[in-house]
Regions:
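Short amphipathic alpha-helix segments
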Residues: 209-222
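Core subunits and conserved enzymes of cellular information-processing
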Residues: 2-212
Length: 222
């Protein structure tokens, strides 16, 4: 039974479903709440929204795809092929969701909108993180920096979002930035909750001369 569960969790259909459902929910949060209210989310999606508000030249989904191209070119060389493949699919789903979903959730109060948007984005992110891939953007950069320079993933996310929201105060009204911060806080809490629902995915870095033997032993006990 343990082996079958392990194979199911690491199988392609299971991860495709997670990335698809998570990307759709995330896209609904961005297109149905954040974009109509002028909010920005954290991470690369927030950067794309900020650039869109600033320039209005390209839709956020197209910007997200363009910014991900050089990242995935680097990722092809430095991250695992499995993570790369799933992340490429996740990025495509999120790009299409942001651009093609034609939905505006009828929430007029900005604080309620920040709450609903945070719940949707956090839920979508949590489902994506349960897969063996990502939605591209910050996730791929964080893995690259962690592998090449030993920079902690959480540290990179924190510094990126600090810079993003600090710059937002220059380009957007203060009220919108504060509501965006509230939405990001809600999304982070929902993300943690979704991850803890079935927290079976752990990551550990093992440095040893017998890495192959250790890996085989771990897999045999799962």
């Amino acid at each position: 039974m343990k082996i079958s569960v392990h194979n199911y969790a690491y199988g392609i259909p299971y991860n495709i479903i997670l990335l698809t459902v998570g990307g759709l929910i995330f896209g609904i949060g961005v297109k149905g709440i954040a974009l109509p209210h002028g909010f920005i989310s954290g991470g690369f999606s927030g950067l794309c929204l900020l650039v869109y508000y600033w320039t209005g030249l390209l839709p956020p989904g197209v910007l997200y795809f363009i910014l991900n191209v050089p990242i995935f070119l680097l990722g092809w060389r430095y991250v695992s092929r499995r993570f790369f493949g799933y992340s490429l699919y996740g990025m495509a789903i999120l790009t299409l969701s942001i651009d093609l979903i034609d939905l505006q959730i009828a929430v007029k109060d900005p604080m309620l909108a920040a709450l609903v948007g945070g719940c949707l984005i956090g839920c979508g992110s949590g489902i994506i993180f349960h897969s063996l891939g990502s939605a591209g953007g910050n996730d791929v950069i964080a893995v690259l920096l962690n592998q090449r320079f030993n920079i902690r993933i959480g540290t990179f996310f924190f510094l990126f979002n600090i810079g993003l929201f600090a710059f937002s105060f220059v380009r957007l009204p203060v009220d919108l930035v504060l509501f965006s911060l509230a939405m990001s806080f809600v999304s982070s809490q929902v993300l943690e909750y979704v991850l803890n629902i079935s927290n079976q995915r752990k990551m550990a870095l093992i440095v040893s001369e017998h890495s192959n033997r250790i890996a085989q032993e771990i897999l045999s006990r799962l």
